[in-house]
């Protein structure tokens, strides 16, 4: 299983240890997304920054769309299915399955590990970016609903 983590809030007024954790997760700007494996190290980092990000389990279809639409190579070159197959020796769907299963990390491929997304179309549909998802906001854990948000942001 892999998590998609999207930074929702900015950097003004963020405590130093949380800002450092955001840097370690490569979430330098708002609407940046990373896909990370499910292990105790990353889980602890996510719990620390939960008041500034939203996260959940990403599915295969969303990850394939994310790689093809928003994935980039060094030099800001766009990705195509043929280019992904040439660079990783795997089709995009199989690459997505292996990333979700934890067999491959995105940082082990030539794909840039950060996906730069648009703000969500029609907004977050919630009470704002200062409240948790469980009480009507946009922050924190949102399980499979992260896929709907990512589709709105691609």
From Swiss-Prot:
It holds the Pfam family Ribosomal_L30. One of its GO terms (cellular component) is cytosolic large ribosomal subunit. Part of the 50S ribosomal subunit. Gene3D superfamilies: 1.10.15.30, Ribosomal protein L30, ferredoxin-like fold domain. GO terms for molecular function: RNA binding; structural constituent of ribosome. The keyword Ribonucleoprotein applies. GO terms for biological process: maturation of LSU-rRNA from tricistronic rRNA transcript (SSU-rRNA, 5.8S rRNA, LSU-rRNA); translation. This is Large ribosomal subunit protein uL30. HAMAP family: Ribosomal_uL30_A. CDD domains: Ribosomal_L7_archeal_euk. Belongs to the universal ribosomal protein uL30 family. It comes from the Archaea. InterPro entries: Ribo_uL30_ferredoxin-like_sf, Ribosomal_uL30, Ribosomal_uL30_arc, Ribosomal_uL30_CS, Ribosomal_uL30_euk_arc, Ribosomal_uL30_ferredoxin-like. Keywords: Ribonucleoprotein, Ribosomal protein. Signal peptide: none annotated.
